[in-house]
A protein has these predicted regions:
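Extracellular/periplasmic, surface-exposed regions of secreted and cell-surface proteins
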Residues: 1-242
Length: 242
């Protein structure tokens, strides 16, 4: 929407994602042939077992954006997301991720347009933003929920089937966050015959979702933890000719 020299654009939305996975299988033992058809027909039918399973995940999101433009010279944008993931415990299910950017089209200023005719475009921009990550390296679906394994144990000379908690659970698990910083310049010369774009960036990931080793004598698997940080810095440069 435009109001004289001012232009404002607004966007708001919501998203609901649900994923369901199911599998079924049949197992037989005793085959000794490399021929698949022959092997299946000669397998021990009494050893046949069927199995099935699956899992479900869900994510709910709300998001919004506002863009402001004054005389095509001064630009501002703000974004905000709120995401909830079923992978995290209820107390940390929601993550909130803002982002901001601003730009100045120096080439639209009168003191440039009237005095530097060979400069077609000059824009300075600055950005900061934060996003979230819910993925574990092992693609663990329920890192904050107790899971159980099955086995056998001898007791009083008899063999019993058992179920036991296979790992510790971290009820403080939360979103990993990725924070981006960017400073850039865009320039075009001689009616944009030639030009370049240069961006300096810094990307920092905090509270990475990892499994840190624990002592084997504990007898249970390691819990997922927010335990890592990574930082990357660099630049991107592109040069063009039309």
């Amino acid at each position: 929407k435009s109001f004289g020299d001012h232009t404002i654009n607004l966007l708001a939305g919501a998203e609901q994602v649900e994923y369901t996975y199911r599998y079924t299988g049949v197992y037989r033992s005793g085959g000794g042939s490399n021929d698949l058809t022959e092997s299946v027909n000669t397998l021990d039918a009494s050893s046949q077992k069927t199995y099935d399973g699956g899992y479900e995940t869900a994510r709910q999101s709300y998001f919004g954006r506002i863009q402001y433009d004054y005389l095509s010279k001064y630009l501002f944008e703000a974004n905000f997301r709120a995401d909830a993931s079923s992978r995290f415990p209820k107390n940390n299910r929601w993550g909130y991720f803002p982002a901001f950017s601003a730009g100045w089209r120096v080439s639209e200023e009168a003191f440039v347009k009237d005095n530097v005719d060979w400069l077609s475009n000059l824009k300075l921009r600055l950005g900061w933003g934060r996003t979230g990550n819910e993925e574990l390296a092992s693609n663990d679906i329920y890192p904050a929920v107790p899971t159980y394994a099955y086995g056998n144990t001898m007791l009083g000379g008899n063999l019993y089937s058992t179920a036991y908690e296979s790992r510790y659970v971290n009820d403080q698990l939360q979103w990993a966050t990725v924070t981006n910083y960017e400073l850039g310049i865009e320039a075009g010369f001689l009616n944009n015959l030639i030009g370049f774009e240069l961006s300096l960036y810094k990307k920092k990931t905090d509270d990475m979702l990892l499994y840190l080793p624990i002592q084997g004598v504990i007898g249970m698997g390691a819990p997922a933890q927010n335990a890592g940080s990574v930082e990357n810095t660099g630049f991107d440069l592109s040069i063009f000719h039309n």
